[in-house]
Every structure is written in C-alpha cells, then in structure tokens.
C-alpha cells in the first residue's frame, strides 16, 4: 500500500466500505433468527457501530 494515497482512491475505498457495510446490515436484517428480539439486535448493531468507528 503506498504511503501517500491519492484522494480519489481514498474516496473509492470509503464508498466501497460503506456499500459493503450496508449490504452486511441488509443481510443481517433479512436473515437474523426471528427468536432474537429486535431490541437486542439493535443494541448489538449499536455496539458494533461504535466499535467499528
């Protein structure tokens, strides 16, 4: 990885990461077990979001 990354490459990277996170969130919403309460799922997502950023 180059030491000085060009701005367009950084923007493409950020956009790709945002899209990947959105896809993962959609998959989590669609395929999460129904036995898990929505409150617990929301708490887990909040903790994960705070840890990620």
From Swiss-Prot:
Transmembrane segments: 10-30
Presence of keyword Transmembrane: yes
Membrane topology: Single-pass membrane protein
Compartmental location: Mitochondrion membrane
Keyword Transmembrane helix among record annotations: yes
GO cellular component: mitochondrial membrane; proton-transporting ATP synthase complex
A single GO BP: proton transmembrane transport
Disulfide pattern: none
The entry's keywords: ATP synthesis, CF(0), Hydrogen ion transport, Ion transport, Membrane, Mitochondrion, Transmembrane, Transmembrane helix, Transport
Similarity-based family: Belongs to the ATPase protein 8 family.
Physiological role: Mitochondrial membrane ATP synthase (F(1)F(0) ATP synthase or Complex V) produces ATP from ADP in the presence of a proton gradient across the membrane which is generated by electron transport complexes of the respiratory chain. F-type ATPases consist of two structural domains, F(1) - containing the extramembraneous catalytic core and F(0) - containing the membrane proton channel, linked together by a central stalk and a peripheral stalk. During catalysis, ATP synthesis in the catalytic domain of F(1) is coupled via a rotary mechanism of the central stalk subunits to proton translocation.
The protein's assembly and partners: F-type ATPases have 2 components, CF(1) - the catalytic core - and CF(0) - the membrane proton channel.
Annotated protein name in UniProt: ATP synthase protein 8
